[in-house]
Amino acid sequence: GNHSRRTHKPRAKLRARDNFDWFLAHQLALLLKSDDRITFQIPEATDALVPVHDTTFLLTHGDQTRGGSGIGGLWPPLLRMRAKKLQNYASMGSPFDIMDVGHWHTLIQAASNGLIVNGSLKGRDAYAATSNFSFEAPQQALWVTVPKNGVVWQAPVLVGDRKSEGW
C-alpha cells in the first residue's frame, strides 16, 4: 500500500521493499514459520497474482493510475488500468480474471466485470473531507470464490461500533 511507504513519493525501483507492510509481512512470516497451517506470499513487486481454484486475482494498490473525480467517476481510470494490466500480464503468459484494488477507498463489487475495489476500514477522514470525496461508511469487500464458477457471492463487511453509534 501507499500509506505505509517510507518516502513521501512512491518509488519505482524496489517499491515493495520501501514499505512497512512488506517489512511487517516478513517479520510475521519469520515468527510463524513453524506453523505449517499458515503460508505467506509476499511479492517483491507492486502486484501479486493469486490463483484461487480456477480464478486468478491480480492484487494491486491501484495508485498507478490517476483520475476518478470527474463526471465518469472511478470507472474510466479503473477500466483503463485493468485493460493495460491485463494486456501486459497476458503478453507474459499470466492473464488474470479479476483485478482487486484499494487506493480509492470506495467499495465496488463488480467481479462479473473483472473488478473489485475495496472500501476503507477507517472510513471518512480529514483528507477525504478537504478533498471533497464522497462519504462512504467504513467497509471492506467480502466474496466467495468456488471452483469452475469463480466469484459467486459478494457482500460488504460493514465496520462499526453498534453501541457507540446507537444502532
Which residue stretches match the model-derived regions?
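Catalytic cores of extracellular degradative/oxidative enzymes
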Residues: 2-13, 48
